[in-house]
């Protein structure tokens, strides 16, 4: 069983319908949820993240499959994965992350992705020109990333 299927199976087996309804309502019914509390959700892929970190290779096919899933917990998994692997993310990965920024947009994912982009900015100054371009984008969420990615810089200075 591949890692996506294994995690999906765990999410489905542990679904909390009552909590899923509340979570969806909180997000204005924009997304479906399994209703998993954060500690429970993270426990299902904690070991996977450890293994991935040891491999030092970002599995973009796995991440794409997760991000495309209809349930919001999978987008959260992608963000947790990217945070775990941020040491290995480079400027060249920003185009892949941009696909996530443009898809299933809402505060929860955008505010997580801006920190990931912000951490890449510490390693590569080319991000500065890209963020200037994004700051003029017609998409509100892309502009938000361009502005908010700087929060990491404030914390480091």
Model-based region annotation:
Residues 1-157:
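Alpha-helical scaffold domains
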């Amino acid at each position: 069983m591949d890692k996506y299927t294994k995690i999906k199976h765990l999410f489905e087996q542990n679904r909390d319908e009552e909590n899923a309804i509340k979570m969806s309502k909180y997000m204005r019914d924009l997304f479906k949820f399994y209703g998993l509390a954060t500690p429970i959700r993270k426990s299902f892929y904690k070991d996977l993240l450890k293994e991935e970190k040891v491999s030092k290779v970002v599995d973009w096919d796995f991440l794409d499959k997760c991000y495309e899933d209809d349930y919001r917990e999978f987008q959260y998994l992608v963000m947790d994965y990217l945070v775990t692997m941020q040491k290995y993310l480079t400027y060249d990965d920003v185009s892949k992350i941009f696909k996530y920024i443009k898809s299933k947009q809402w505060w929860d994912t955008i505010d997580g992705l801006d920190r990931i982009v912000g951490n890449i900015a510490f390693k590569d100054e080319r991000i500065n020109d890209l963020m200037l371009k994004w700051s003029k984008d017609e998409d509100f969420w892309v502009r938000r990333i361009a502005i908010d990615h700087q929060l990491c810089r404030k914390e480091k200075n």
